[in-house]
């Protein structure tokens, strides 16, 4: 085992003790909160840098042990499908464009999810945008996004879909090396 992987396992063991008595939802919220001030980096999902969907996928991995790495749109369409989530469900807020638009180098189509923010408290989300992620009030974010022609939807996680995708080892598009190390450390900790 290399030194970096050992450090990762030791860190995860310490975190495991902290979250030991928490539910999966509480762990998800905890790990989202711990990700405040991560550097924003497109295509990343690790403990030093992440993009919006990467932060949600990493929180899911740390909270549930289930590994997926997908876009915000795929999270919305495949995994966060509960339209009326219970307060104890793992939840995320999705920002859906009302028309075709270009953001950076990517063109998003009408009704495609352009952004996701994991809910880590009542009306509190981890908003992972440049230059770094921060905890924000969803109520404070809504007027800006609505004025810029986005629809905001909060959905709950379909835990069975997440488990099946993880068990089948699907939906891991382009997971970065650090995400894989975390996944391997979690799998190693399980035995």
Residue ranges, per PLM feature:
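Secreted/periplasmic proteins that engage bacterial cell-wall peptidoglycan
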Residues: 13-78
């Amino acid at each position: 085992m290399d030194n970096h992987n050992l450090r990762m396992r030791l860190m995860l063991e310490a975190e495991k003790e902290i979250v030991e008595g928490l539910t999966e939802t509480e762990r998800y919220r905890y790990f989202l909160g711990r990700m405040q001030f991560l550097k924003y980096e497109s295509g990343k999902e690790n403990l030093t840098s992440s993009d919006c969907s990467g932060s949600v996928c990493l929180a899911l991995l740390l909270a549930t042990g289930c590994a997926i790495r997908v876009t915000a749109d795929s999270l919305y369409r495949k995994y966060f499908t509960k339209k009326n989530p219970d307060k104890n469900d793992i939840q995320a807020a999705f920002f859906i464009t009302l028309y075709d638009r270009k953001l950076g180098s990517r063109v998003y189509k009408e009704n495609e999810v352009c952004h996701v923010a994991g809910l880590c408290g009542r009306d509190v989300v981890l908003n992972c945008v440049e230059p770094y992620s921060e905890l924000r009030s969803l109520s404070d974010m809504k007027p800006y996004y609505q004025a810029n022609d986005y629809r905001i939807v909060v959905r709950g996680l379909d835990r069975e879909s997440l488990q099946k995708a993880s068990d089948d080892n699907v939906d891991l598009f382009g997971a970065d090396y650090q995400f894989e190390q975390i996944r391997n450390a979690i799998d190693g900790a399980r035995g």
